[in-house]
C-alpha cells in the first residue's frame, strides 16, 4: 500500500475515533428509526426482521416465489418484518442496471405484505451501477438508476434504501471517498424529498473498512444518509479460489495494519468496524454462517456485537441474514433467530 493510502486511512481512523468518543455521532443512533419502537422497555428495544437474502438459494432455485416471501416469513419463522432484496424483483435496463418490476407487480407485493400484517423495513439494492464511479456520466447514471428503487421503497412503506459505496478500487482511498460521497449526497438529497433514508452497508472493498465508510458518511453530511452495519461483511478482499486474482486484489491493501488475513480473505476487525459504523446506523444486519453445539455463531460473538449496538443507543430492527452453507436456509434462520432472542435478553 502506498504512503498516501496509509495516511488517508490513518486520518480516517483517528477522526472517527475522536468523534465517537466525543459524542459527535450520537444523534443518528439515539433517534428511533422510522417505524421502530421508541420505548425505554429493554424487552422491545430490538425487533427481529428477516433479510430476504437469507432465502436466496430457495428463491433462485424456484422453491420460493418473491411474492410469497411475506407469508412464508410469518408462517415459518414467526417474524413480522422483512428486508427486500432487489435481485428478486427486477428487470434489466441497458444503462441504469437493475430496475424494479412494473407498478402492478409492486402493488401485489404491497398487498401481500398488508394481507399478512407484515412490515417492509428496507430494500437492499445491488447492480445499479457504482455511486462512486470515476466516470461522471456513469456516476450520474448510477445515482439516477437508484431513483426508481427509492420510489419502490416509498411505495412499499420502507424507511430506507440500502445501497453500496463502490468506486474504482485502484484509486487511492481519498479519491474513492470523494467520489462515493458525491454520489451518496446526490442520492440522499433526492431521498430526503421522499422522506427516505439512504443507508450504506459494509459490502466489500473500502466500504468494509469501518473508519473509511464512517468518514464518507460524515462527509456526506446529511441526516438521512447512514449505515447498515453487517456483522460479517468486513472483508475488503475475499479469496474466491482464483489465486492470481486474489493476490492482485490484495496488493491494493498491502502494508495496512488494519487488516488481518485468514482463509476467507483480507479482513478489517469486525468489532471495531461495527463500533465505527453504529453511530450512523439506521439498521443492523446480523450476519450468521455457522453455529456450535450451544447455538453460538462461530465467527462472530453476538453478545459482544449487540453490546456495541446497545451502547450506540440504537433502537429498531436487527435483520437476520443467514448466509451459511452447512445448514439448510430454514434451520440457519431459526438458529440465528434463537441466538438473537437469547442475546437480546442478555444485553
Regions found by a protein language model. Give the residues of each.
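Acidic/histidine-rich catalytic cores of soluble enzymes
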Residues: 63, 81-82, 175, 181-307
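Catalytic domains of carbohydrate-active enzymes, especially glycoside hydrolases
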Residues: 67-87, 157
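Glycine-rich, proline-tolerant flexible connector loops at the mouths of alpha/beta enzymes
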Residues: 83-108, 168-171
Amino acid at each position: 500500500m502506498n504512503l498516501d493510502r496509509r495516511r488517508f486511512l490513518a486520518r480516517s481512523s483517528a477522526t472517527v475515533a475522536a468523534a465517537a468518543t466525543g459524542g459527535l455521532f450520537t444523534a443518528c443512533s439515539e433517534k428511533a428509526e422510522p417505524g421502530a419502537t421508541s420505548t425505554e422497555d429493554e424487552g422491545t428495544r430490538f425487533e427481529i426482521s428477516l433479510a430476504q437474502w437469507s432465502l436466496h438459494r430457495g428463491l433462485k432455485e424456484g422453491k420460493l416465489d418473491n411474492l410469497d416471501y411475506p407469508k412464508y416469513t410469518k408462517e415459518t419463522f414467526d417474524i413480522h418484518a422483512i428486508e427486500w432484496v432487489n435481485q428478486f424483483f427486477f428487470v434489466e435496463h441497458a444503462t441504469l442496471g437493475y430496475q424494479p418490476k412494473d407498478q402492478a407487480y409492486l402493488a401485489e407485493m404491497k398487498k401481500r405484505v398488508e394481507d399478512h400484517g407484515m412490515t417492509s423495513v428496507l430494500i437492499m439494492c445491488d447492480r445499479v451501477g457504482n455511486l462512486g464511479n470515476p466516470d461522471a456520466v456513469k456516476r450520474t447514471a448510477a445515482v439516477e438508476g437508484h431513483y426508481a428503487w427509492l420510489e419502490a421503497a416509498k411505495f412499499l412503506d420502507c424507511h430506507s434504501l440500502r445501497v453500496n459505496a463502490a468506486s474504482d478500487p485502484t484509486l487511492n482511498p481519498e479519491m474513492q471517498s470523494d467520489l462515493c460521497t458525491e454520489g451518496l449526497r446526490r442520492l440522499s438529497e433526492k431521498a430526503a424529498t421522499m422522506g427516505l433514508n439512504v443507508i450504506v452497508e459494509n459490502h466489500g472493498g473500502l466500504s468494509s473498512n469501518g473508519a473509511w465508510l464512517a468518514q464518507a458518511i460524515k462527509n456526506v453530511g446529511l441526516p438521512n444518509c447512514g449505515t447498515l452495519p453487517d456483522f460479517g461483511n468486513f472483508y475488503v478482499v475475499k479469496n474466491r479460489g482464483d489465486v492470481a486474482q486474489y493476490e492482485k486484489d490484495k496488493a491494493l491493501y498491502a502494508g495496512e495494519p488494519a487488516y488481518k488475513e485468514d482463509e476467507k480473505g483480507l479482513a478489517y476487525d469486525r468489532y471495531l468496524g461495527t463500533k465505527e459504523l453504529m453511530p450512523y446506523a439506521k439498521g443492523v444486519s446480523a450476519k450468521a454462517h455457522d453455529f456450535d453445539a450451544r447455538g453460538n455463531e462461530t465467527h462472530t460473538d453476538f453478545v459482544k456485537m449487540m453490546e456495541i449496538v446497545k451502547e450506540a443507543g440504537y433502537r429498531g430492527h436487527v435483520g437476520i441474514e443467514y448466509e451459511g452453507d452447512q445448514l439448510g436456509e430454514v434451520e440457519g434462520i431459526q438458529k440465528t433467530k434463537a441466538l438473537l432472542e437469547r442475546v437480546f435478553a442478555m444485553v
